[in-house]
A protein has these predicted regions:
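N-terminal cofactor/phosphate-binding cores enriched in small/glycine residues
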Residues: 141-165, 172-178, 196-206, 210-212, ...
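N-terminal glycine-rich dinucleotide-binding loop that anchors FAD/FMN and/or NAD(P) in oxidoreductases
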Residues: 171-196, 201-202, 343-357
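Alpha/beta-hydrolase fold catalytic core
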Residues: 105-118, 123-127, 391-442
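Short beta-strand to alpha-helix junction loop
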Residues: 191-209, 221, 388-396, 423-434
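Rossmann-like dinucleotide-binding core of oxidoreductases
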Residues: 121-128, 133-149, 153-163, 168, ...
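Extreme N-terminal leader/targeting segments of oxidoreductases
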Residues: 1-129, 268-286
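Feature captures the FAD/FMN-dependent oxidoreductase FAD-binding
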Residues: 54-104, 195-264, 400
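Glycine/threonine-rich phosphate-binding loop and adjacent beta-strand/alpha-helix elements that clamp
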Residues: 447-456
């Protein structure tokens, strides 16, 4: 298959609002961000692939995109290679179909210019100066890349035998990310994701690839557990006591200690009376037994947060029964691209046209982060403060309520009161959902645990 045909196949299914941004930069023609080429605002967390255009406009945009990309690949320079902050805000506003604040320009500029990440100048580091980083998970790797790029001597202490942190530990069925893969990754380290929302295995592989690509493992001490850190005021240094896999202990010294240990370890167990004497099998999802089968088991799942959203649907068809105990309900948003593979054509486009990949990621950043910001401000004159913050937030409530009711089906009458939060949408972290409402068999507040069963 020719390069032209591969590009044509990819552009035929590509995201229209993203293609428009590529068109503007490649051609310098700003008619692509004016009517009739302004996408309509997308709903929810969807990618808005069609942009809300009819087939004729979509074809015009796709044809123009193919021509512009082929010209660029043939040597035509990018007409608008470095848009100003103001131009970037204008472009993103058009692409999203809604007003993007002016202050977003600087971040957009940085995001679009960070691949690959380059350090123009090394930091002038005093002789003997060194940094200790605790943890080689997501934060630890990002810190290590930055320190290495700046020329600052450092050492990473990691208690596991490999990098990736929580994505090495969390091995429960269905473990994955509920942020889009192309957003849940470093801007300086793009990746050929196979799924729109990656599962644990691919996430671990990604962070391992970052460590390899930036040659970080030479600076990581694996199977090294930090026991304590103590600041020495007289020398303005830190003493870091560590234990190695062979049982030996050592005290290290550093000018700076950066903790990237994360918040998910060790696992937090609920304070339930009788938990320590429960005679049945029990474990925390963060310590899931490798290869454990739940076939024909009566299972109780305590908690209904993000982990439960992933675990419940994964095991519901294996177990004899599944009962969910919750402290309180959460708002959930549809998770339409969960377990959806990125088409090979789009993976090719991401690889061959960096502008497309970067603008796609930039749009995701707006959709999943700042889009709802204005709707989170409390309206002092709003007539329904008992259920929402303002009119927009109330429309969010109606949408999510309707979604829950639809998913519960004929169980809506008896479960709706139990799964519907009383606080406003986005009052807590939103949970992404594929089919968890359908998984629910009961929702009760856990108060104590007997030797054989939960009691409430």
């Amino acid at each position: 298959m020719t390069d032209k045909q591969q590009l044509a196949d990819a552009i035929a299914i590509a995201n229209i609002p993203t293609l428009l941004m590529v068109l503007v930069q490649l051609t310098g023609d700003k008619r692509w961000i004016a009517d009739p080429y302004r996408p309509k605002r997308g709903s929810g967390t969807g990618d808005n692939d069609s942009g809300g255009f009819d087939e004729a406009i979509q074809k015009e945009i796709r044809d123009a995109s193919l021509a512009a990309i082929l010209a660029w690949k043939a040597g035509e320079p990018v007409a608008l290679e470095t848009p100003s902050n103001e131009e970037l805000v204008e472009m993103l506003t058009s692409s999203m179909g809604e007003k993007v604040p002016a202050e977003y320009g600087e971040m957009t500029n940085a995001q679009l210019g960070q691949t690959p990440m380059k350090w123009e100048d090394k930091i002038d580091v005093p002789e003997g100066f060194n940094v200790i980083v605790i943890g080689a998970g997501v934060s630890g790797l990002a810190t290590a890349v930055s320190l290495q790029g700046a020329g600052v001597p450092f050492k990473v202490l990691e208690r596991r035998s490999n990098v990736a942190g929580v994505w090495q530990d969390n091995r429960y069925p269905g473990a994955g990310v509920d942020t889009p893969s192309h957003l849940y990754s470093f801007s300086f380290a793009p990746y050929d994701w196979s799924a729109y929302f990656a599962l644990r295995g691919e996430l671990a592989e990604y962070f391992e690839s970052v460590a390899d690509d930036f040659d970080l493992k030479k600076s990581i001490e694996f199977e090294t557990n930090v026991i304590s850190t103590e600041y020495q005021a007289d020398t303005q240094t830190w003493k870091v006591k560590v234990a190695h896999a062979d049982g030996s202990e050592e005290t290290l010294e550093a000018n700076v200690v950066i903790s990237c240990a994360g918040i998910f370890n060790p696992p937090a167990f609920p304070n339930i009376q009788g938990l320590d004497s429960f005679a049945g099998e029990s474990w925390h999802t963060a310590e899931w037994p490798e290869g454990k089968s739940l076939d024909n088991k009566k299972v109780i799942m305590i908690g209904n947060g993000a982990t439960a959203m992933q675990l419940g649907p994964e095991i519901q068809n294996q177990v004899e029964s599944l009962t969910i105990f919750q402290r309180g309900p959460h708002w959930v948003s549809p998770f339409e691209q969960f377990r959806v593979d990125v088409p090979e054509e789009i993976r090719y486009l991401f690889k061959e046209v960096p502008l497309y990949r970067m603008w796609y990621r930039m749009r995701l950043g707006w959709i999943y982060n700042d889009r709802v910001y204005d709707s989170l401000h409390k309206d002092p004159n709003w007539e329904h403060p008992e259920r929402s913050l303002n009119a927009t937030n109330d429309s969010h409530r109606a949408y999510f309520t309707s979604y829950m009711k639809k998913e519960l089906g004929d169980r809506a009458d008896d479960l709706m009161d139990k799964v519907l939060p009383t606080f406003p949408p986005f009052g807590k972290r939103m949970l992404m959902d594929k089919s968890s409402p359908k998984t629910a068999t009961s929702t009760k507040l856990t108060s104590s645990l007997s030797q054989r069963a939960l009691t409430c």
